[in-house]
């Protein structure tokens, strides 16, 4: 019985912490003069708490594991909801494809540039000039 209660407590604590960060983000988003989704702010709050080790990762692991495991199932209602606007998507297909392609290229360039900035040029073992 004690083990069962411990498992229930771990899942409950994980989901409460995740939802607390979500609702804190929604509250902060309502106060901001710019439009930033509260879920994004909540995710950043959770990231900061985990990165600064204010919140131990083992406290949110059970809830994160469940959410990631069933992520594909959680996207089904979103996909069905998008199909309500199929006519609008068909009319705007060109701009949607162009914006997806451009944003993918921009993300690719920013990630490659920042990776190069952070990691710099590394010498490969066996490469000429790598002997010290």
UniProtKB/Swiss-Prot annotation:
UniProt-annotated location(s): Cell inner membrane
Source organism superkingdom: Bacteria
Membrane topology, from the record: Multi-pass membrane protein
Protein name as annotated: UPF0299 membrane protein YohJ
HAMAP family: UPF0299
Name of the encoding gene: yohJ
GO CC term, one of those recorded: plasma membrane
Similarity section: Belongs to the UPF0299 family.
Keywords noted in UniProt: Cell inner membrane, Cell membrane, Membrane, Transmembrane, Transmembrane helix
Sequence ranges on the Periplasmic membrane side: 1-6, 52-62, 114-132
Cytoplasmic compartment residues: 28-30, 84-92
Keyword Cell inner membrane: yes
Transmembrane regions listed in the UniProt entry: 7-27, 31-51, 63-83, 93-113
